[in-house]
Amino acid sequence: MELSEPIVENGETEMSPEESWEHKEEISEAEPGGGSLGDGRPPEESAHEMMEEEEEIPKPKSVVAPPGAPKKEHVNVVFIGHVDAGKSTIGGQIMYLTGMVDKRTLEKYEREAKEKNRETWYLSWALDTNQEERDKGKTVEVGRAYFETEKKHFTILDAPGHKSFVPNMIGGASQADLAVLVISARKGEFETGFEKGGQTREHAMLAKTAGVKHLIVLINKMDDPTVNWSNERYEECKEKLVPFLKKVGFNPKKDIHFMPCSGLTGANLKEQSDFCPWYIGLPFIPYLDNLPNFNRSVDGPIRLPIVDKYKDMGTVVLGKLESGSICKGQQLVMMPNKHNVEVLGILSDDVETDTVAPGENLKIRLKGIEEEEILPGFILCDPNNLCHSGRTFDAQIVIIEHKSIICPGYNAVLHIHTCIEEVEITALICLVDKKSGEKSKTRPRFVKQDQVCIARLRTAGTICLETFKDFPQMGRFTLRDEGKTIAIGKVLKLVPEKD
């Protein structure tokens, strides 16, 4: 069976994604090769390894399909990379190849793109929804689209690649299970994306910080005249990327998979391409379908970090369920404001459903709270198991990039799960030796680039957070300043407020 054609029964042909819910084949839950991606890797000596200690929390992904439909595993894929690497184009092409966007719609986009002299961008219009993005050809919000393979249901998070949009990218990465780093093989473009100031480095680092375990590197634009499906150019790009990705904390043998492709022609995305006989391995979509299952558990406490909210016959919140399961009619609490709410309705990837499990992207209609009383970064919890909230915490941080020294009193912007808040480093507690993990006996007066320290941080307002040990997804963070990611960190302990 072709991998991603809609399954047809009883002689029916055209089906919308909604109808096809009723028509899917039974898929065995216990897939061979299950288990978390990228476990048991050798300790690499890099700052990021220190971030990735025991993650025993159930992995935040699972799926409950609407009644009567078989279950497919939900996986969030974030496309990352430099601004013109071709992320949206690949996203659009995948939507087309898996039958989520039909030829007519694609041709309409192609015509509109031509009229605006944006010819090669037509595929990305399937993802870029608003006019401003289409005019600029840049993806600003995190675009959302989904496609299905035989065994899995994928949501594409198309994260922007422009420098000023990195905070949006962080939101995308914090919801992703899997990252696809799109690299342009075109002469000059690869170099721009990768050199200082290019987005490639920062995006890969953010994905790792956000807890993305598995990275697929698509070397795109292989059809470009400057590349012409050259194996040498492909290997050259690979060689330059591996040391960097290793430094960020990805294990090249277990966590990274490279493949060549062309987003514009669709070569090597769904079917093996004749252009690169030198590439042995599955094309992109079959490779995704055959990934081992993510370890998942529905028994954890309910945690749903809010990404966005709007008014529509009540208050609707958007987010990815990180842990636990939610059902219609359930009483929940919105933290940190301890607002009691009731679940009136649930949409999982725009399909109405009564119960959902971790990993699903949800729109939840709530009763008992106004839209203006909610901010991104708030968290929906079980009344009997609230998340922690506060302003002061101790954390281990790694200074990634900062020209000058950092002293107590330093201010930055904290990005933790879906929350963005101003933060001050109020005290430096000790330095941590990168290799041995030993802590210094004396308090440092300052820290500088590439050092690891334990520090006390205090946010401007109350935020929801957990220790990294208890809940990795809500205990890892980045610090940004002047448009750059300057540090990554993990929460070690919450410090109670003094009255």
From Swiss-Prot:
Q: Which reaction does it catalyse?
A: GTP + H2O = GDP + phosphate + H(+)
Please give the residue ranges the record annotates as the region G5.
262-264
G3: where is this region?
158-161
EC number(s): the record gives 3.6.5.-
Q: Which GO terms describe its molecular function?
A: GTP binding; GTPase activity; RNA binding; translation release factor activity
Q: Where is the composition biased (Basic and acidic residues)?
A: 41-50
Q: Which CDD domains match?
A: EF1_alpha, eRF3_C_III, eRF3_II
Q: Which domain of life is it from?
A: Eukaryota
Annotated GTP binding lies at D84, A85, G86, K87, S88, T89, N220, K221, M222, D223, S262, G263, L264
Q: Which PROSITE patterns match?
A: G_TR_1, G_TR_2
What ranges does the record give for the region G1, renumbered to this chain?
81-88
Give the record's GO CC terms: cytoplasm; cytosol; cytosolic ribosome; translation release factor complex
Described by its record, this protein's role is as follows: GTPase component of the eRF1-eRF3-GTP ternary complex, a ternary complex that mediates translation termination in response to the termination codons UAA, UAG and UGA. GSPT1/ERF3A mediates ETF1/ERF1 delivery to stop codons: The eRF1-eRF3-GTP complex binds to a stop codon in the ribosomal A-site. GTP hydrolysis by GSPT1/ERF3A induces a conformational change that leads to its dissociation, permitting ETF1/ERF1 to accommodate fully in the A-site.
Q: In which family does this protein belong, per the annotation?
A: Belongs to the TRAFAC class translation factor GTPase superfamily. Classic translation factor GTPase family. ERF3 subfamily.
Q: What is this protein called?
A: Eukaryotic peptide chain release factor GTP-binding subunit ERF3A
